[in-house]
UniProtKB/Swiss-Prot annotation:
One of its GO terms (cellular component) is extracellular region. The keyword Cytoplasm does not apply. Residues 24-146 form the C-type lectin domain. It comes from Deinagkistrodon acutus (Hundred-pace snake). It is found in: Secreted. Residues 1-23 form the signal peptide. Keywords: Blood coagulation cascade inhibiting toxin, Calcium, Disulfide bond, Hemostasis impairing toxin, Metal-binding, Platelet aggregation inhibiting toxin, Secreted, Signal, Toxin. InterPro entries: C-type_lectin-like, C-type_lectin-like/link_sf, C-type_lectin/snaclec_domain, C-type_lectin_CS, CTDL_fold. SUPFAM superfamilies: C-type lectin-like. GO terms for molecular function: metal ion binding; toxin activity. This is Snaclec agkisacutacin subunit B. Ca(2+) binds at residues 64, 70. Anticoagulant protein which binds to the gamma-carboxyglutamic acid-domain regions of factor IX (F9) and factor X (F10) in the presence of calcium with a 1 to 1 stoichiometry. Also inhibits platelet aggregation by binding to platelet glycoprotein Ibalpha (GP1BA) and functioning as a blocker of von Willebrand factor (VWF). Is devoid of hemorrhagic and lethal activities. Possesses antithrombotic and thrombolytic activities. Also hydrolyzes the Aalpha-chain of fibrinogen (FGA). Does not affect the Bbeta-chain (FGB) and the gamma chain (FGG).
Length: 146
């Protein structure tokens, strides 16, 4: 009987430690480094995509990237599920080119693009960022902290 209780307790500890990782994201979202991500194949303008993301989950915004590994993770999510290779990301030019800002308010500490327009898309085929007219409609990726 004592062995059964010990094994049961051990399994409970393992289950509880695992439940704190991906279980923090809703079942149809993907987890990476404490954040949840979901691609949407519903072309919208940058502003409409950002608004849509904020309505999906508390704290959700268009995806921000803070490392090449994070950007690569999002590419693995979008490549099989989207019909296009361009997705809106949360970076936008504020104040006529003087200031770039992530829509979730996080610091711009990683960048990979050529500036031309006010909003950015990520090309999922080669993980390249491109500036694009904010009124163009594209698929997008939402992100929130788990």
């Amino acid at each position: 009987m004592g062995r059964f209780i010990f094994v049961s307790f051990g399994l409970l500890v393992v289950f509880l430690s695992l439940s704190g990782t991906a279980a923090d994201c809703p079942s149809d979202w993907s987890s990476y480094e404490g954040h949840c991500y979901k691609p949407f194949d519903e072309p919208k303008t940058w502003a409409d995509a950002e608004k849509f993301c904020t309505q999906q989950h508390k704290g959700s915004h268009l995806a921000s990237f803070h490392s090449s590994e994070e950007a690569d993770f999002v590419v693995t999510l979008t490549t099989p599920s989207l019909k296009t290779d361009l997705v809106w990301i949360g970076l936008k030019n504020i104040w006529n080119g003087c200031y770039w800002k992530w829509s979730d308010g996080t610091k711009l500490d990683y960048k990979d693009w050529r500036e031309q327009f006010e909003c950015l898309v990520s090309r999922t085929v080669n993980n390249e960022w491109l500036s694009m007219d904010c009124g163009t409609t594209c698929s997008f990726v939402c992100k929130f902290q788990a």
